[in-house]
Design a protein with these regions (language model features):
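Hydrophobic alpha-helical membrane segments
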Residues: 1-173
Length: 173
């Protein structure tokens, strides 16, 4: 049930070359794998994080990694993490990055030097929150539940994504 929207998106997106994903696995496959490995709540948040990172600056951020990996077809290689939270030492605090994204979605990514990811994350959460508010004010309980769930998912994705962005910042050369 949780991957039904992913299957629907794949049926639509795989028909158009203009919707090819710059990542391997594709964002939709990453989402399905995340849900399978980490459950519906955390897996959906990881998928939301990936969607926020799938922006025009993704390649720029990827090549700054300690060991940027590419799939044999040239796409950016980024597998679902086995362990979500890990100990790390360095200049950027993953805990602080997460707290900053709790205060303001996207701020933790900006702190971790991923400004565009933070901006896309903020815009996504703000858009979903606005749609939730509009659904609520229009007395649409279905819309409120759907958009409220999406807002919560992307908000949690921002918190987890900020943590991981700080870990990655500490692993850069």
């Amino acid at each position: 049930m949780a991957i039904s929207p992913i299957s629907l998106w794949q049926r639509l997106s795989y028909r158009s070359g203009s919707l090819n994903c710059q990542f391997y696995p594709s964002c939709s496959n990453y989402g399905a794998q995340s849900i399978a490995q980490h459950g519906v709540i955390l897996g959906s948040a990881l998928a939301a994080d990936r969607i926020a990172r799938c922006n025009p600056m993704a390649y720029h951020y990827h090549i700054k990694a300690k060991e940027p990996l590419f799939h044999n077809d040239g796409r950016l290689l980024n597998h679902v993490p086995i362990k979500l939270f890990s100990d790390t030492k360095g200049e950027k605090s993953p805990a602080l990055a997460s707290v900053l994204s709790i205060v303001a979605p996207g701020l933790g990514r900006v702190y971790a030097n991923r400004t565009w990811d933070g901006l896309f994350g903020l815009l996504t959460v703000a858009t979903m929150a606005n749609l939730t508010y509009k659904s609520h004010t229009n007395n649409s309980s279905t819309g409120t539940v759907i958009f409220g769930g999406l807002t919560a998912t992307f908000y949690l994705g921002e918190i987890i994504g900020a943590y991981q962005a700080a870990v990655e910042a500490n692993n850069r050369p």
